[in-house]
C-alpha cells in the first residue's frame, strides 16, 4: 500500500469513527432527555386516586458507559400510593385480652405538669396509635383544676398524643371541644369537636388539619357525640350524635362525612329507645356501635349502620349479663335482644362490646352500682340468644377496690385480620375522693390475643394523699 492509500484509509477510518462517536453522543443526549422527562410515566389519576408508575427500561451496551461519566440522570420520584381504609379483613379470633399500654397520668401529676382530662379514647392511623382526651384547660397542680368535675366549659380542648405519652404541656390541642370523636380514613384524620352553649352548641368537622364543615344544635339540649373513635370505610366516615334529654326522649342522628364534609344525615331507627356515647367498630361493609341507654335500659343498645345506602337499624345486646352501670344483680338482669330492660336505666356509663359469631365479648365495671373495678368476658350465645348468661374467659382488668370509669373500643388492622382493643378510663378525684378539688384520669389499654395470658390488676395507682389538692 503506497503512502497515499495509507493516508486515504486512515482518513476514512477516522471519519467513520468520528461519525459513529457523533451519532452516539446524539443518542446519549436523547437518552438523557428521555430519562429526565419519561423515566416514570404516570397515567392521569382518576378522582381521589394515585396510580402506580411503570418504569421505562432502557437497554444500552457497555460502550455507552464511557460517555455517561459526566452525565447527570435525574429520576422522577413517584408519589406513594395512599388508599382509603376499607376494613375488609375478618375479625381476629381471640382467647382474651393482653395488656398493651398504660399512661400513669395521675401518678406523674404528683410531680409534673400534666393536663387535667376526662373522656379519653384511643384511635389508630394505618401506622400508629394515638390517645385522645378532653382537657380542662389546666394542669393538675394548678388552682384552675378546682371544679373540673364539670363536663362542659369553653376551656375544654381535644388533646392528642402518641399512645403511651401522657398529656404534658407540649401536647397538641386539636380543637375546642367538650365532646368529641376522631378517626383516620387512610389518608387523614377527621375530628368531630363539639363546644359552645348547652342550648346552642356547634359541632366542627376538622379534616387533615382544616375546618371543612359544621352543624349546630338541632334540639337545643347539649349536642354530644361518642367520646371514642368514629369509623371510616372507603373514604366515608360515620359518627353518632345525640341532642336532647339525658334521661328521656332525645334526637339521635347518624352523620356520614367524606373528607370532612357532611354528605348525609340519617335519623335513628329500630327499637333502641335512648342513645349516648357509642363505641363503634367496622364490620365490613358496615359499621356497628354499642351504646349507652341513659333512660330505660341497663342492657346496651346496638346500632347497625349500612355505609352503602345509609340505612340504620337498632336493637339491644342479647346477653342477660348486661353491660351498663348501675344494673341489677346478674341473677335478676335480663335482655330480650330488642327492647330496653327497664332495669336501673339511669344514669349509665360509656362501655363497649363486640359480636363474635353468636357470642359476644364485653367489658363492664365489677361493681353493679359504682364505677369501680373492671372485667371482661365472653357470653356464649350473647349476640343471638335472648337473656343468655353463660360466661367464659373472664379477666379482671382493675380490681374492685379501685376506681374505673368510661371504656370504649378501637380497632387495629393486622396483616391477616382486624383486632379489637379497648381502653378503660381510671377516674381519680371528685366525686368519690373529696380530699381534692379536681377530677382527672389515667388510662389502661388491652388488645385481643389468640395466645395465653395471666392475671393481674392495673389500677390508676396514685396515692391520693400525695396529690395536690
From Swiss-Prot:
Residues 11-33 are annotated as: Involved in apical transport and lipid raft association. It is found in: Virion membrane; Host apical cell membrane. Ca(2+) binds at residues 293, 297, 324. The keyword Transferase does not apply. Keywords: Calcium, Disulfide bond, Glycoprotein, Glycosidase, Host cell membrane, Host membrane, Hydrolase, Membrane, Metal-binding, Signal-anchor, Transmembrane, Transmembrane helix, Virion. It holds the Pfam family Neur. Inhibited by the neuraminidase inhibitors zanamivir (Relenza) and oseltamivir (Tamiflu). These drugs interfere with the release of progeny virus from infected cells and are effective against all influenza strains. Resistance to neuraminidase inhibitors is quite rare. The chain crosses the membrane at residues 7-29. The active site is at residues 151, 406. CDD domains: Influenza_NA (cd15483). This is Neuraminidase. The lineage of its organism: Viruses, Riboviria, Orthornavirae, Negarnaviricota, Polyploviricotina.
Amino acid at each position: 500500500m503506497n503512502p497515499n492509500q495509507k493516508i486515504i484509509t486512515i482518513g476514512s477510518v477516522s471519519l467513520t469513527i468520528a461519525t459513529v462517536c457523533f451519532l452516539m453522543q446524539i443518542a446519549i443526549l436523547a437518552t438523557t432527555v428521555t430519562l429526565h422527562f419519561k423515566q416514570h410515566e404516570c397515567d392521569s389519576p382518576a378522582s381521589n386516586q394515585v396510580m402506580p408508575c411503570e418504569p421505562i427500561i432502557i437497554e444500552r451496551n457497555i460502550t455507552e458507559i464511557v460517555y455517561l461519566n459526566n452525565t447527570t440522570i435525574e429520576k422522577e420520584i413517584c408519589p406513594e400510593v395512599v388508599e382509603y381504609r376499607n376494613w375488609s379483613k375478618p375479625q381476629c379470633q381471640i382467647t382474651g385480652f393482653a395488656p398493651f399500654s398504660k399512661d400513669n397520668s395521675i401518678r406523674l401529676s404528683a410531680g409534673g405538669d400534666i393536663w387535667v382530662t376526662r373522656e379519653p379514647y384511643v384511635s389508630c392511623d394505618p401506622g400508629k396509635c394515638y390517645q385522645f382526651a378532653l382537657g380542662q384547660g389546666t394542669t393538675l397542680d394548678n388552682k384552675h383544676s378546682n371544679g373540673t368535675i364539670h363536663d362542659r366549659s369553653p376551656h375544654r380542648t381535644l388533646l392528642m398524643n402518641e399512645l403511651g405519652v401522657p398529656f404534658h404541656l407540649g401536647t397538641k390541642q386539636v380543637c375546642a371541644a367538650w365532646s368529641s370523636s376522631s378517626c383516620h380514613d387512610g389518608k387523614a384524620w377527621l375530628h368531630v369537636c363539639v363546644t359552645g352553649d348547652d342550648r346552642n352548641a356547634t359541632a366542627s368537622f376538622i379534616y387533615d388539619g382544616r375546618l371543612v364543615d359544621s352543624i349546630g344544635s338541632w334540639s337545643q339540649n347539649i349536642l354530644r357525640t361518642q367520646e371514642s373513635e368514629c369509623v371510616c370505610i372507603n373514604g366515608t366516615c360515620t359518627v353518632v350524635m345525640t341532642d336532647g334529654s339525658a334521661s328521656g326522649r332525645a334526637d339521635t342522628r347518624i352523620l356520614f362525612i367524606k373528607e370532612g364534609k357532611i354528605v348525609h344525615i340519617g335519623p335513628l331507627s329500630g327499637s333502641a329507645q335512648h342513645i349516648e356515647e357509642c363505641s363503634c367498630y367496622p364490620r365490613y361493609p358496615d359499621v356497628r356501635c354499642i351504646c349507652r341507654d341513659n333512660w330505660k335500659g341497663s342492657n346496651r343498645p346496638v346500632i347497625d349502620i349500612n355505609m352503602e345506602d345509609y340505612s340504620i337499624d337498632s336493637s339491644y345486646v342479647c346477653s342477660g349479663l348486661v353491660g351498663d352501670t348501675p344494673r341489677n344483680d346478674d341473677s335478676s338482669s335480663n335482655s330480650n335482644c330488642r327492647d330496653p330492660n327497664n332495669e336501673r336505666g339511669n344514669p349509665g356509663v360509656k362501655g363497649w362490646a363486640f359480636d363474635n359469631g353468636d357470642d359476644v365479648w364485653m367489658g363492664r365495671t365489677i361493681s353493679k352500682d359504682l364505677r369501680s373495678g373492671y372485667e371482661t368476658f365472653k357470653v356464649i350465645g350473647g349476640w343471638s340468644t335472648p337473656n343468655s348468661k353463660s360466661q367464659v374467659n373472664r379477666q379482671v382488668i382493675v380490681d374492685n377496690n379501685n376506681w374505673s370509669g368510661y371504656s370504649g373500643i378501637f380497632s387495629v388492622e393486622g396483616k391477616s385480620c382486624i383486632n379489637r382493643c379497648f381502653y378503660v378510663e381510671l377516674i381519680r378525684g371528685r366525686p368519690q375522693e373529696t380530699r381534692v378539688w379536681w377530677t382527672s384520669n389515667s388510662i389502661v389499654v388491652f388488645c385481643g390475643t389468640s395466645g395465653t395470658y395471666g392475671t393481674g390488676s392495673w389500677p390508676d395507682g396514685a396515692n391520693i394523699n400525695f396529690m395536690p389538692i
